[in-house]
Amino acid sequence: MDYDEFVIEDLREVYGSYINEFLESIKKPNPRLYVRVNTLKTTIDDVLRQLPQFKRDEDFEEAIYAEVKGPNKINIYDDKVIVDKKTAESAMMGANVYKPGVKKVIVSGNRKSYVTVYSDNGIPVAEGIYYGMHSDLVVEVTNSLYSSPKLADLELLKRGYIYAQGKASMYVAHLLDPQPNETIIDMTAYPGGKLTHIYQLQPKARIIGFDHTSKKVEKLRELISKMQMRIEVYKADSRYLYEDFNIKNVDKVIIDPPCSALGVRPKIYDKKTKDDILNFHEYQKQFLNAAYKILKERGVVIYSTCTVTTWENEKVVEDPRFSVEYEIRFHPHVHNMTGFFIAKLIKKG
């Protein structure tokens, strides 16, 4: 991992002498692959009958998981396909390789030859059957560094019966504790996991999601439709909801802002600098400022990130306009989950 001294010092503030354990842990995937069952549309038992490799979670009744296996041995072939970081991190978990993620192809034979898939920094992450660059599917992965069910291929996922969501992320909706007739706003709603989870827990609340691009809003609406939920979604820069929409007296707000994603794993490699972290910090504070304007007195904010720096977590929520009811951290090397931070804030009267 290529982190400058500022980032390392911040991580050391969190992890102390265990910083190396943390840095090693983010190179590996979570040992469990979680999905959330849409219990408004199906039952846990019915899904488990169709997905026998999954098991019930110990804490959340709507959560099931499959065990991730590996590391596995990757065969090294003369023919190779080199992919970008994001594609490599998916392929190492067993996902197929599609054209947008391919950076270079070195293949001497015909299509349907076996190839090794490499990250762009030279790490072999998978092997499979090469279909050529003429089609969207470039490599059908047959063996990967780690293996888990290919969720994207499941009809249950395509039809809205299940949703891929990490366990740490599932805590957010539960800690929000949505109640009937409350107005709840998700300020950064895409890709929709927390938004739809809130509705699943409390369909009688008024739930509104915002995101700032038309494409993301369209995808959110597609997700909501296939999950058969009644959620409002609008395109907006949610830092200006009060000014642009005159929204006020909201009961609860979720903020899951853009962040450095240091807690996300597995990572093939990563690079972050002081400027990256401080820019995120300033951006994140703007969402909290907007939440203050639209919340009622004693209204609730659940602030969460998939990163672990103090600058993007504790130093964001330390705001004199709010009282911090609690803060929770999940550590990859301790809890075997994504590195994650959640805080519950109350707007002062």
Which positions does each model-derived feature cover?
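Short beta-alpha connecting loops at secondary-structure transitions
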Residues: 156-157, 267-277, 329
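Conserved helix-to-beta-strand junction in the class I
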Residues: 175, 201, 287, 293-297
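Conserved proline-anchored active-site loop of SAM-dependent methyltransferases
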Residues: 176, 184-194, 250-267
